[in-house]
């Protein structure tokens, strides 16, 4: 399994158990699903609860939402367009410092900055239609995931977007 973690905070943002793709080498787009589950349950794709277990759902609290948000404990936040631009300035500066700390070469840093700029240009025009989510630590300096609802095959599909160069892949 691959866990995609926020490079700055270490928060788990998503795993490869979700359907995802890389767009133009700069954005991860992760398909989400609406789910309902008993409080505390984590349902992974392919998991099959035992049919012999008694159903104890009668007294349990049921939570509903997007699988990615519930499983990774992402926290919704809000931004105006101006606030988001201010956030991006601080975020890109912190990322560049992190890349230097990781001893990335100048050419790697320049390529990552170019890709990050490309990703920002893709999301800024649709900012008013997006929802914003931060990682479990609620650190406002970390990566902010962007949620967009798109029409796919006449169905509304929630797609969570992450800046590729703000994530670290951890194989477990």
Swiss-Prot record:
Instruction: State the species of origin.
Output: Loxosceles intermedia
Per UniProt, subcellular location reads as: Secreted
Please state every residue range assigned to the domain named TCTP: 1-172
Additional notes on this entry: Secretion of this protein from cells may proceed via an ER/Golgi-independent pathway, probably mediated by secreted vesicles called exosomes.
Q: Under what name is this protein listed?
A: Translationally-controlled tumor protein homolog
Question: How is expression of this protein distributed across tissues?
Answer: Expressed by the venom gland.
For this protein's source organism, the top of the classification is: Eukaryota, Metazoa, Ecdysozoa, Arthropoda, Chelicerata
Q: Which GO terms describe its cellular component?
A: cytoplasm; extracellular region
Instruction: Spell out the family assignment given in the record's similarity comment.
Output: Belongs to the TCTP family.
Q: Which UniProt keywords apply?
A: Secreted
Give the InterPro entries listed for this entry: Mss4-like_sf, Mss4/transl-control_tumour, TCTP, Translation_control_tumour_CS, Translational_control_tumour_p
For this chain, one GO molecular function annotation is: calcium ion binding
Question: So what does this one do?
Answer: Venom protein that causes edema, enhances vascular permeability and is likely related to the inflammatory activity of the venom.
């Amino acid at each position: 399994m691959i866990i995609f973690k926020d490079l700055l905070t270490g928060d788990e943002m998503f795993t490869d158990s979700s359907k995802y793709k890389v767009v133009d080498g700069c954005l991860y787009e992760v398909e989400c699903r609406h789910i309902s589950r008993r409080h505390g349950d984590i349902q992974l794709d392919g998991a099959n609860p035992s049919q012999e277990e008694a159903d104890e759902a009668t007294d349990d609290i049921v939570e509903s939402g997007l699988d990615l948000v519930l499983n990774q404990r992402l926290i919704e936040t809000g931004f105006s367009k101006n606030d988001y631009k201010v956030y991006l300035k601080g975020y890109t500066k912190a990322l560049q410092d992190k890349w230097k700390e990781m001893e990335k070469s100048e050419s790697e840093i320049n390529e990552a900055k170019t890709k990050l700029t490309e990703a920002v240009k893709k999301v800024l025009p649709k900012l008013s239609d997006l929802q914003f989510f931060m990682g479990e630590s609620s650190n406002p300096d970390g990566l902010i995931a962007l949620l967009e609802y798109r029409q796919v095959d006449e169905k509304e599909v929630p797609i969570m977007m992450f800046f590729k160069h703000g994530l670290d892949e951890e194989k477990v």
